[in-house]
Swiss-Prot record:
The modification Phosphoserine is found at residues 171, 182, 327, 405. It comes from the Eukaryota. It comes from Mesocricetus auratus (Golden hamster). Acts as a transcriptional repressor for zinc finger transcription factors EGR1 and EGR2. PANTHER family: NGFI-A BINDING PROTEIN, NGFI-A-BINDING PROTEIN 1. Homomultimers may associate with EGR1 bound to DNA. This is NGFI-A-binding protein 1.
Length: 485
């Protein structure tokens, strides 16, 4: 089975590693799965590495996996073992500035390309030098091919570790290209798109900032000898001086400045790189900001927040636009399954309304019951009061009948009692009896409605009571024998 040949620089590096591990049979599988980036294999965690091994069909052969791991470790610690003469290969996955200096494809950096390219851009936007392109010339048949490569971000530079990194990595910063006295910097820099976004944002912000007074700056430098010794020469340079921007970048850096105590090998983050670039651009617009680092830091952070948000949002949208995937936040509703959420909510609201109505009705029934009880209590009290009045009336009747009879017996005062004996005749009975019957009629009318609904027995007792009391009074009277004298 013929092995495919590498076509790019990334594929060539993978080819050399697999060749050293005697695993060239997996080269085609790696290329089919998009595994032409060796750094991805070196940086992958345990789970991700095992997943890659499963994709290329190496997971079932642990000895092959160990040979590949050993080759990757050798490539990280000593990349020189894998350097082979390169042919005319297009650079795709590995940036050219990370090639060793001895590589035939390394031809150095041309800073003049910045002046050539900047003239074709808008005149009011000044492109930073860290976004300058590099020239790459191939060796094929004496013909040169010029290609532009943007400087990669800090995430890629972190992948190159080991003692060979200081030898193989070549800085593209203007400080290394320009003055030899400039501080030593790493290859960390923003890519062209991010640097251009910073320049645009600084251009908008510079129009809103107040213009600094040059006389005040000179007075400040005159009073501060240390500051004047450090940055005084920058204010004496003309704007056409090519080294002025390099010096501004040198002393305007917020993070990782040449006089900072940052540990060697500690790389700057994307935020720190953006802040440094924004500070440099702001100081290029207004040199006086070099003397006010607190204000410069605040403005640079503001630019960094805006640029990072816009750049990340744009990049994310571009990546998401290439995928035809559903949003993870979208609720998936399958066809054929009705949505019961709304009917359940409607039923719940109806049940709540019914329960509220029942509670209101029960409270009303309770109030009506209490009112009925109060009415019954009042009627009972009135009934007892009338009974007491009736007893008093009966007592007065007996007393008055005794007063009119000289021998203690009532005298006859009506014609209807003429047939009765004298001792049974009761005077004033005709006058007093209607009083009781009137009271009886009033009581009947008063308790007729209450007695029908609550107690029918009370009404019978109440109606029969005056008659029984009257007959009882008649029965109490005893007849006395007539005196024979």
């Amino acid at each position: 089975m013929a092995t495919a040949l590498p076509r790019t620089l990334g594929e060539l590096q993978l080819y050399r590693i697999l060749q050293k591990a005697n695993l060239l049979s997996y080269f085609g599988a790696f290329i089919q799965q998009g595994g032409d980036d060796v750094q991805q294999l070196c940086e992958a965690g345990e789970e991700e590495f095992l997943e890659i091994m499963a994709l290329v069909g190496m997971a079932s052969k642990p000895l092959h996996v160990r040979r590949l791991q050993k080759a990757l470790r050798d490539w990280v610690t000593n990349p020189g073992l894998f350097n082979q003469p390169l042919t005319s290969l297009p650079v795709s996955s590995i940036p050219i500035y990370k090639l060793p200096k001895g590589s035939p494809t390394w031809l150095g950096i041309s800073c003049n390309s910045y002046e050539r390219n900047s003239s074709a851009r808008e005149p009011h936007l000044k492109i930073p030098k860290c976004a300058a392109t590099t020239c790459v010339q191939s060796l094929g048949q004496g013909k040169s091919e010029v290609g532009s490569l943007a400087v990669q971000s800090v995430s890629e530079s972190r992948l190159w570790q080991g003692h060979h990194a200081t030898e193989s990595e070549h800085s593209l910063s203007p400080a290394d290209v320009g003055s030899p006295a400039s501080p030593k910097e790493s290859s960390e820099a923003l890519d062209a798109a991010a640097a251009l976004s910073v320049a645009e944002c600084v251009e908008r912000m510079a129009s809103t900032l107040p213009k600094s007074d040059l006389n005040e700056v000179k007075e400040l430098l005159k009073n501060n000898k240390k500051l004047a010794k450090m940055i005084g020469h920058i204010f004496e340079m003309s704007d056409e001086d090519p080294h002025k921007e390099e010096e501004i970048r040198k002393y305007s850096a917020i993070y990782g400045r040449f006089d900072s105590k940052r540990k060697d090998g500690k790389h700057l983050t994307l935020h720190e790189l953006t802040v440094n670039e924004a500070a440099a651009q702001l100081c290029v617009k207004d040199n006086a900001l070099l003397t006010r680092r607190d204000e410069l830091f605040a403005l640079a952070r503001q630019v960094s927040r805006e640029v990072t948000y816009k750049y990340t949002y744009r990049t994310t949208r571009l990546k998401c636009g290439e995928r035809d995937e559903l949003s993870p936040k979208r609720i998936k509703v399958e066809d054929g399954f009705p949505d019961f959420q709304e009917p359940v909510q409607t039923l719940f609201q109806q049940a709540r309304a019914k329960s509220e109505e029942l509670a209101a009705l029960s409270s009303q029934q309770t109030e009506k019951g209490m009112a009925k009880q109060m009415e019954l209590l009042c009627a009972q009290a009135s009934y007892e009061r009338l009974q007491q009045e009736r007893r008093l009336t009966a007592g007065l009747y007996r007393q008055s009948s005794g007063e009119h009879s000289p021998d203690g017996l009532p005298s006859d005062g009506s014609d209807g009692q003429g047939e009765r004996p004298l001792n049974l005749r009761m005077p004033n009975v005709q006058n007093r009896q209607p009083h009781h019957f009137v009271a009886d009629g009033e009581l009947s009318r008063l308790y007729s409605s209450e007695a029908k609904s609550h107690s029918s027995e009370n009404l019978g007792i109440l109606k029969d009571y005056p008659h029984s009391a009257f007959t009882l009074e008649k029965k109490v009277i005893k007849t006395e024998p007539e005196d024979s004298r």
